Amino acid sequence: MASRQPAAKKPPAKKAAVPTKAPAKKAPAKKAAVRKAPARKVAAKKPAPKPAPNPTGGVYKLARALWLGVAHAVGAMFRGIGQGAKGLDPAHRKDGLALLLLGLALIVAAGTWSNLRGPVGDLVEMLVTGAFGRLDLLVPILLAVIAVRFIRHPEKPEANGRIVIGLSALVIGVLGQVHIACGAPARSDGMQAIRDAGGLIGWSAATPLTYTMGDVLAVPLLVLLTVFGLLVVTATPVNAIPQRLRLLGVRLGVVHDAQEGLAEDDERYDEQWREALPPNARRRGPAPAGYDPDGDEQEALSKRRSRPRRSAGQQPDLNRPMDAVDVAAAAAAALDGAVLHGMPPSPLVADLTQGVTVERDGYEETTPVPAARAKAVKPPRKEASKAGVPDLTKAPPAETRDLPARAEQLQLSGDITYSLPSLDLLERGGPGKTRSAANDAVVASLSNVFMEFKVDAAVTGFTRGPTVTRYEVELGPAVKVERITALTKNIAYAVASPDVRIISPIPGKSAVGIEIPNTDREMVNLGDVLRLADAAEDDHPMLVALGKDVEGGYVMANLAKMPHLLVAGATGSGKSSCINCLITSVMVRATPEDVRMVLVDPKRVELTAYEGIPHLITPIITNPKRAAEALQWVVREMDLRYDDLAAFGYRHIDDFNEAIRNGKVKLPEGSERELSPYPYLLVIVDELADLMMVAPRDVEDAIVRITQLARAAGIHLVLATQRPSVDVVTGLIKANVPSRLAFATSSLADSRVILDQPGAEKLIGKGDGLFLPMGANKPTRMQGAFVTEDEVEAVVQHCKDQMAPVFRDDVTVGTKQKKEIDEDIGDDLDLLCQAAELVVSTQFGSTSMLQRKLRVGFAKAGRLMDLMESRNIVGPSEGSKARDVLVKADELDGVLAVIRGEAAP
């Protein structure tokens, strides 16, 4: 009703024109207003006239469609050719460029050396002769030389930029001088005059100089530019010009070779070399048949003379990569006399040692080393050249080469000379594979899995190891890593392998790693690892070979830096092979004066092959009780070493030994002690579980003390077990053994005990392991090295032939007189001894007295009284009265010895 009020009031405004019956016509007036709006719209908008049909429009559209179709077809054809060109081998591309340059050289030679007719000849004359002038005859020779270089050295593209810059400077300088020598014709003299001089290049180089400076300064500047180009092309620095000229003169026969004048110096050097030998150095045992000492000496001298020697003022060749000698010199200068072993090098030295290749033939000269401080010398070796890498694989490690036999021997006490075993005693493995058809099939399977589950990810590469291959997967934008880890079972199903391990992410890379076992596994030989360049350059006696990682690189570790190692794995996982590799590595690299060993083998069959080697400080221990006593001796030895370090003011055994060798350690006056360097002491326990079952308290206490304190004393511990449970590898042992090596385990719980993280339960056994060194966040997957029984026997026999073992008698002393402490005493041994001493000395057996004197509670005092009653020290209880004391005061020492488990005095 309220909405109709305005409509009812509008008609009265029109009542002046309509005097009567206006209210009755209100409804028709509204209808008329509604009808007028459509009439106005029809009148306002009229349809536009349609254009007349164009007869040429269809033809135009047809022609346009045909043109676009042809253009797309031609573009697709050329794009296909371009994609095919991208797939060509890089060597074919370089050969194609070289052949193109040869063809161009032939065309230019035909146009410049002969009167070639036709448009090609005119083009050559216009371009080549017009640009190079009188020297156009040398252009085809220059092109041919460049083409031959591309053919002979296709693997050195990094020098192309240098050669282009040098040739440009050389050509510009020479043509500028030719232009000035021919009178410096200008453009007004005509193009023919410029062609008869240095061409357009010579005119462009010489005209600005002659215009601004004149000929007097222009010619020297162009000569300097020419010399600069020549030095750049030949890669010769200015300070090496005399050396290069001397070498060129020697090759041409113009200059006398300075090396021939050193013959007299060789003879004098030979005398010094003979005098440097130890006077008492001789072979142990009878000499082999056919051995001629004088002949061998002359042969060695002739070989030494045949090595290239530098004169005093001769500088090293600057047109070669740095070799190991240069790196060592730079490292020594950077460290300024610091001890390299036992501390990490500076970042400068670390960067300096990266990417070093040795390209020298022969050996470098070394200064004779006194026999008392001689070490096994590792001569330099060649690194194998790296072959071409397939599409998805990473660069394989350099292959190992033969190392020359060690010629230097380490002098021991007296007249004994100990020679290290040769690496020829260890077998050599075959070259490792970098790619196989199985890897390509796995890449295709992974790509199909990602496509089926609509995951934006792609396999960008893989690195093949001896046991597993790690495939690198890069994720697309906004793709969660959890989408890859959730597909673990699907990936295992696709590649038909249950042992799939996913690493998210790969350390140091923005990629997810998928480790899948190889169907064609490879064996890693111990000899291949020890022949590695790093092993040859590092003479530390505690460097041991472990195996080969998933990226194809060899894994070695220094036991002195670990400083203790826990090795664990189920039966058949490769634990025993790892222990054999550790012991064999030490025997091959260290003498008995460098490293002594204590071997504990409760199983009695694993380490018996090493019985009798001179590195042993005691016979192999098979009795668990004697093993506990040996560990106690190691603790005492550690304390004695620390006493010496504290007395003479040294913090590490290496510094103490170095001071002894240099004669810096002085004994007090009147002391009859003879100081000698302490060897490293390596304790290897093959089965920790057996020791923990027999004497858990003594073994754990000794191991904890050794692992906590023995690093600076040069004592290192290797613990191995096939039952890595919490009652064997306790929390105290784990906390003090930072380096772990886990082989295949039977459960996730065992993996967490060893590594504190999962992963070992997914290993496939037979040497497949996870190595977690001290300070690393994630373990490295590796294939453990393998050494055969024949190899071990050969190395052991060589060591036995050198010298007999010298055992110490105090390692397991007292095991027959000493007995175990009674279990009912527990941790109350000290309190029980104090209580017995108090009761016997006072002859008064009262529980309340024990409470007051020992400050213990009633329960503890009553327990001590019961323990003394069971050992016949006091009599039975008589109510509130004091107990009778059954032991006299003069028998107290014997009672205390029995309580402590010692023999009665």
Curated annotation (Swiss-Prot):
PROSITE patterns in UniProt: FTSK
Region annotation (Disordered) ranges: 1-55, 263-321, 372-403
Keywords: ATP-binding, Cell cycle, Cell division, Cell membrane, Chromosome partition, DNA-binding, Membrane, Nucleotide-binding, Transmembrane, Transmembrane helix
Gene3D superfamilies: 3.30.980.40, P-loop containing nucleotide triphosphate hydrolases (3.40.50.300), Winged helix-like DNA-binding domain superfamily/Winged helix DNA-binding domain (1.10.10.10)
Compositionally skewed regions (Basic residues) per UniProt: 23-48
All copies of domain FtsK, residue ranges: 552-752
Binding site for ATP: 572-577
One Gene Ontology biological process: chromosome segregation
Topology, Cytoplasmic side: 237-905
Pfam family, one: FtsK_alpha
Principal localisation: membrane
GO-annotated molecular function: ATP binding; ATP hydrolysis activity; DNA binding
Family affiliation: Belongs to the FtsK/SpoIIIE/SftA family.
Domain topic, free-text comment: Consists of an N-terminal domain, which is sufficient for the localization to the septal ring and is required for cell division, followed by a linker domain, and a C-terminal domain, which forms the translocation motor involved in chromosome segregation. The C-terminal domain can be further subdivided into alpha, beta and gamma subdomains. The alpha and beta subdomains form the DNA pump, and the gamma subdomain is a regulatory subdomain.
Summary of subunit composition and partner proteins: Homohexamer. Forms a ring that surrounds DNA.
Protein purpose: Essential cell division protein that coordinates cell division and chromosome segregation. The N-terminus is involved in assembly of the cell-division machinery. The C-terminus functions as a DNA motor that moves dsDNA in an ATP-dependent manner towards the dif recombination site, which is located within the replication terminus region. Required for activation of the Xer recombinase, allowing activation of chromosome unlinking by recombination.
Record-given protein name: DNA translocase FtsK
Native organism: Streptomyces avermitilis (strain ATCC 31267 / DSM 46492 / JCM 5070 / NBRC 14893 / NCIMB 12804 / NRRL 8165 / MA-4680)
Encoding gene per record: ftsK
